[in-house]
Structure formats: structure tokens, C-alpha cells
Amino acid sequence: MSNRKPYVREVKRTWWKNHPFYRFYMLREATVLPLILFTLFLTFGLGCLVKGPEAWQGWLAFMANPIVVAINIVALLGSLFHAQTFFSMMPQVMPIRLKGKPVDKKIIVLTQWAAVAFISLIVLIVV
């Protein structure tokens, strides 16, 4: 064994701020934070639904709070942003071929958004 100390390069905690790719990545991954709050709000709402009408009305009043509405809007925008980045990566990760020819990337992305719109419409009709 050697007594020599190996060189360990110092890495600052904010190293990712200097690279646009990593800033974008961190922003995309940070979209989960408002979604966590949204999920907690809904879970709390389910608990209130089980407790009875008074608890349910209290939860509805809580959800009408402007801060909660703002958090929900940020969560929606974050999930749409995350979906957009995911959909734009999909043609690169899994190229699709029809009759031996590659399908245009824009068509793949637009098809995914059309599926989201269709499913959202079905959910709105059913609920």
C-alpha cells in the first residue's frame, strides 16, 4: 500500500449551474416538488371524504385557498412541461418505423399529445 495521497478534484455543490444542459435537467426534475404537494392534497381530500360531509366541506374550502390554487396551477404547468420534454425525447429513444421508413419525429410527438387530449376528454366526460 502506498502512502501517496491520490488527487481528489474538488466539486462544488453548484457545479450544475454552469452547464445549460444540467440546469434544464434540474428544472425538469424539480417539477416533481409541486406534484408531491398536489398528491398530498388529494390524499388529504380522500381522508376527509371518508370522515364525512363536514370534513369534506372543510377540504373544499382548503382547496379554494388562493395559495393552494397557485400550487395546483404550478403542478399542472410542471407536469405539462415534464410531459413535453418526455414526449420530445421519445422519438430519439424509440424510433418508430412504418413499412421500413422512419416516422417523422413531429408526428410521433403530436400523436402523443393527441392521445393525452383524447384521454383527458374521456375523463372529463366520465367524471
Curated annotation (Swiss-Prot):
Entry's localization field: Cell inner membrane
Xref: Pfam families: Fumarate_red_C
InterPro entries: Fumarate_red_C, SQR/QFR_C/D
GO MF entries: succinate dehydrogenase activity
Transmembrane region(s): 30-50, 58-78, 107-127
GO terms for cellular component: fumarate reductase complex; plasma membrane
Annotated membrane topology: Multi-pass membrane protein
Keywords on record: Cell inner membrane, Cell membrane, Membrane, Transmembrane, Transmembrane helix
Coiled coil (UniProt feature): none
Quaternary organization: Part of an enzyme complex containing four subunits: a flavoprotein (FrdA), an iron-sulfur protein (FrdB), and two hydrophobic anchor proteins (FrdC and FrdD).
Role according to the record: Anchors the catalytic components of the fumarate reductase complex to the cell membrane, binds quinones.
NCBIfam families given in the database record: PRK04987.1
Protein family according to the UniProt entry: Belongs to the FrdC family.
Full protein name: Fumarate reductase subunit C
Lineage: Bacteria, Pseudomonadati, Pseudomonadota, Gammaproteobacteria, Vibrionales
Gene responsible for this protein: frdC
